[in-house]
Amino acid sequence: MTESKNSFNAKSTLEVGDKSYDYFALSAVPGMEKLPYSLKVLGENLLRTEDGANITNEHIEAIANWDASSDPSIEIQFTPARVLMQDFTGVPCVVDLATMREAVAALGGDPNDVNPLNPAEMVIDHSVIVEAFGRPDALAKNVEIEYERNEERYQFLRWGSESFSNFRVVPPGTGIVHQVNIEYLARVVFDNEGLAYPDTCIGTDSHTTMENGLGILGWGVGGIEAEAAMLGQPVSMLIPRVVGFKLTGEIPVGVTATDVVLTITEMLRDHGVVQKFVEFYGSGVKAVPLANRATIGNMSPEFGSTCAMFPIDEETTKYLRLTGRPEEQVALVEAYAKAQGMWLDEDTVEAEYSEYLELDLSTVVPSIAGPKRPQDRILLSEAKEQFRKDLPTYTDDAVSVDTSIPATRMVNEGGGQPEGGVEADNYNASWAGSGESLATGAEGRPSKPVTVASPQGGEYTIDHGMVAIASITSCTNTSNPSVMIGAGLIARKAAEKGLKSKPWVKTICAPGSQVVDGYYQRADLWKDLEAMGFYLSGFGCTTCIGNSGPLPEEISAAINEHDLTATAVLSGNRNFEGRISPDVKMNYLASPIMVIAYAIAGTMDFDFENEALGQDQDGNDVFLKDIWPSTEEIEDTIQQAISRELYEADYADVFKGDKQWQELDVPTGDTFEWDENSTYIRKAPYFDGMPVEPVAVTDIQGARVLAKLGDSVTTDHISPASSIKPGTPAAQYLDEHGVERHDYNSLGSRRGNHEVMMRGTFANIRLQNQLVDIAGGYTRDFTQEGAPQAFIYDASVNYKAAGIPLVVLGGKEYGTGSSRDWAAKGTNLLGIRAVITESFERIHRSNLIGMGVVPLQFPAGESHESLGLDGTETFDITGLTALNEGETPKTVKVTATKENGDVVEFDAVVRIDTPGEADYYRHGGILQYVLRQMAASSK
């Protein structure tokens, strides 16, 4: 770490017990004491990293003199203490670092200079797919298949962990990255050779903000920005506006943390918090347990905010002790927070905020969200009514969705069973079909009853609204003890009443850490969950990222052959179209407790207040209220089942891994030996032929529109992580390289191979490109006579051959969702030079710049619709060359020429927001910028 210039004489000594620590005292700078918590963390960061060039005393004073009412205008350089990764985004990061070692050497530098300068940690959690479910050996089967499919990736990651210094990998089967982070990896306060400072962490997953619940400032970034941070580059940002969110009251009986977070998500989305910090304060904060704070922080990307911070207080240190942190570390956290004015207690002076919201927690009511956005909250009491309102949208054929996948499918096509893989008895015969029907009570809604014969015997009738997947999944909820214990207890009560999950429901339980398995065993809850079909499926993200695996063959066939509108209910954070399963059209977020309830109901067309879930052994109707666990029951079970010893035991050898991990055949050497025949790991192309000096920025002439899209296009739409559909360009590539269909794996697992990923860009089966009438990865190819329909990738190849640049037109909230760098990498590799939208989500906008694609916005109040653009025009964009003179133009002129010669002109806003971003764009991307800096410094 470079020594700070310390121009404010802020370096001081902190005594904690019998130890002394150096630290940079905020009290040395007038004004710091009145700042919101999150800005105090930024202020300390600048004090500690002040170098007189990139970070000056003027920057420090700008933080101290922050004007809560002003719009962001002052750029600062934030240096995170560490970087966190998961394997889907982490594999391409390691690929890029390995490629950079070779590129540095080619530019005359030392390849061994390419190492993370700050701790970089990866948790492998994105690769497990739920093939087996509802059976005692589901976990073992899914792990076995995971290693078979991902052996090459895992060998590569082990090579990286042994080749790069300051880089550690938590093996698969341990848990979800964000839960492992808050339970083990997070420091809260760093001790770096006697220097104490706040733990700050950026991550290659948007839900990195879960750590905000621990008082750790951090957020999700694209993999390319994370790589730059690992290599010592600070994160360029504007001092943000901070939204103060006041919490009062206490959560009422019968309301879960999930209900609270869905309520907050709706409020903040309605308010508008993109590119803002959110900070929770008020008397209600102390009543929010740490696990609930983490759940709220986790959903920051769904709010749209950069982060969602809670301060450090007694609840924080209580959690650190529970999770096995050393007492010396806990003492440092408390002493440091108090010394810096970062500790919350009754004497804390309320900070000033840019904007204010307030929620009385006692007013929160049971809720779910869906069917396609996390912010679309629905009161549980109105869920049936709202489902019936939404259903016609999904049953009419206004937009044709390409569902030409055969009903009997291979596993990696998103349905059916793998050849030679998991057997057909995926769910327990004890809860097989016995004549149950969803056609009953269908009056008043679209209905298309289909009778299905169960392989286990019997038959049942499914219909629109069937719950095809009920999944306890995701970092948001699956290690929150209150809702996880609650799920086990509602299963127990349901089993006691003789209730069962419906036979058409795929039941999944994938906890966020092994600690959950431990307290389920202690509380003897597994037998009750298993009675509902919820066997342990894996420790990883599973359903929430689209790794729900295939539905049983007969159910998948019935859904697709009869075009049924199936639903999924998951305890996740995202429910975007096409994300959860290709067989499912409507996705709902709910607490783990409600996941169990919906599995029993079997349909979204259900009124939990007035309809019985079934009958008990005496023939009495059983309602949700009859099996809902009380707060006292949940708390008593938590006290009995959860202890510090559980955490200490599970994390004692967290980097060791299981026998399969330890026995992997790992390559050696400082540089990686690329295999040109590999379909998983390929040398990245971004530095091929890169000159020592950047090429001048040019305007864009004669561009064609590759895709014309609407509002809320997600990074899932742009770069899906889920299954690879046969016949698509990505599948054709794998076919040509000898990969069998049952070994396709997911697009997310292939992110180390740019050839697969560029073919999978804009390939989501639900993508609605307005240039064509069919949903999926299609466009019109204007290089061909009559501009016929073509795969987006195939058309891009023709455009490249013809020397024609490309643009994408979009609507509001373009790039919402995951911090998926491949959504920008794929955009770049397809030849797209500019994306023009009404608004961008923060991470994707930054990622586009990081890949040399310019983000542009239509003039305020305008859109491609209002301007009459239909996507058949030729585009010229002028004014970008001003960047060569060191200036970032506020707007550029866009001229769209229609086929009949008519012209539409407008001034597009250039969304290159900071000088640092302008530097990255001038160099063709952030990695090219970093590479040139490294090569120059090592000569």
Swiss-Prot record:
Oligomeric and partner information: Monomer.
Consequence of gene loss (knockout): Cells lacking this gene are glutamate auxotrophic in glucose minimal medium, show a strong growth defect, and secret large amounts of acetate. Deletion causes a strong selection pressure for secondary mutations within the gltA gene, which might be caused by a growth-inhibitory level of cytoplasmic citrate.
Activity over temperature: Optimum temperature is 50 degrees Celsius.
Organism superkingdom: Bacteria
pH relationship of activity: Optimum pH is between 7.5 and 7.75.
Catalytic activity: citrate = D-threo-isocitrate; (2S,3R)-3-hydroxybutane-1,2,3-tricarboxylate = 2-methyl-cis-aconitate + H2O
EC numbers: 4.2.1.3, 4.2.1.99
Cofactor requirement: [4Fe-4S] cluster
NCBIfam families tied to this protein: PRK09277.1, PRK12881.1
UniProt KW keywords: Iron, Iron-sulfur, Lyase, Metal-binding, RNA-binding, Tricarboxylic acid cycle
GO biological process: propionate metabolic process, methylcitrate cycle; tricarboxylic acid cycle
Protein name (record): Aconitate hydratase A
Induction summary: Repressed by AcnR, RipA, GlxR and activated by RamA. Repression by RipA is part of iron homeostasis and serves to reduce the iron demand under iron limitation. The activation of acn transcription by RamA serves to allow the increased carbon flux through the TCA cycle during growth on acetate. GlxR is a global regulator that binds to the acn promoter and presumably represses its transcription in the presence of cyclic AMP (cAMP).
One MF term in the entry's GO annotations: 2-methylisocitrate dehydratase activity
Bound cofactor: record note: Binds 1 [4Fe-4S] cluster per subunit.
Family classification: Belongs to the aconitase/IPM isomerase family.
Chain sites annotated for binding [4Fe-4S] cluster: 475, 541, 544
Pathways per UniProt: Carbohydrate metabolism; tricarboxylic acid cycle; isocitrate from oxaloacetate: step 2/2; Organic acid metabolism; propanoate degradation
Region (Disordered): 433-453
Function text: Involved in the catabolism of short chain fatty acids (SCFA) via the tricarboxylic acid (TCA)(acetyl degradation route) and probably via the 2-methylcitrate cycle I (propionate degradation route). Catalyzes the reversible isomerization of citrate to isocitrate via cis-aconitate. Could catalyze the hydration of 2-methyl-cis-aconitate to yield (2R,3S)-2-methylisocitrate. The apo form of AcnA functions as a RNA-binding regulatory protein.
